[in-house]
Amino acid sequence: MAEREHRRGRREEREETPEFADRLVAINRVSKTVKGGKRFGFAALVVVGDQRGRVGFGKGKAKEVPEAIRKATEQAKRSLIRVPLRDGRTLHHDIEGRHGAGKVIMRTAVPGTGIIAGGPMRAVFEMLGVQDVVAKSQGSQNPYNMIRATIDGLKKEASPRNVAQRRGKKVAEILPSNDKPAEAAVEA
């Protein structure tokens, strides 16, 4: 018994460094019907990220709100994904994500645009570290579905390096250069 408590103490000592920011997206009161009546509890939905290209989400259920949030945060940290960002501020290309009846469309944006996204999507982009993006949610407005659809779309994003590697080319061959549109206009 003493050893078990000792291990717990060690776990608390190495508690996470504040490298991750977290955002509580939704909290619901849930109930379970049992023989004697209803037992109430809470479900929390949390998004966690390092604001430098990693993001994850988690949900937790417990009898008390703080415990539900703690469980959701732990699950979110275990489900982190890495997303390549262009110039550390926006997406490389337009993407679409789906989950259930939810559909999310995310588009790149020029500097200064800001995060134009609703509710749960905004939390994901802020925790990811995106500064300029335009996003639209269609279909299900359920926060769980919106976050899962957003994460699904972000998993599909490919950096120019990944695309070049798959095609067996160099990054410079894939990215459009700035002088080509001018040359095309002169020739026309």
From Swiss-Prot:
Role: With S4 and S12 plays an important role in translational accuracy.
Entry protein name: Small ribosomal subunit protein uS5
Assembly description: Part of the 30S ribosomal subunit. Contacts proteins S4 and S8.
Alphabetized UniProt keyword annotations: Ribonucleoprotein, Ribosomal protein, RNA-binding, rRNA-binding
Entry's Gene Ontology BP terms: translation
Record carries keyword Ribosomal protein: yes
Gene3D superfamilies: 3.30.160.20, 3.30.230.10
GO molecular function: rRNA binding; structural constituent of ribosome
UniProt region (Disordered), positions on chain: 158-188
GO cellular component terms given for this protein: small ribosomal subunit
Domain remark text: The N-terminal domain interacts with the head of the 30S subunit; the C-terminal domain interacts with the body and contacts protein S4. The interaction surface between S4 and S5 is involved in control of translational fidelity.
Pfam families: Ribosomal_S5, Ribosomal_S5_C
Organism whose genome encodes this protein: Paracoccus denitrificans (strain Pd 1222)
Family that this chain belongs to: Belongs to the universal ribosomal protein uS5 family.
Domain S5 DRBM residues, every copy: 20-83
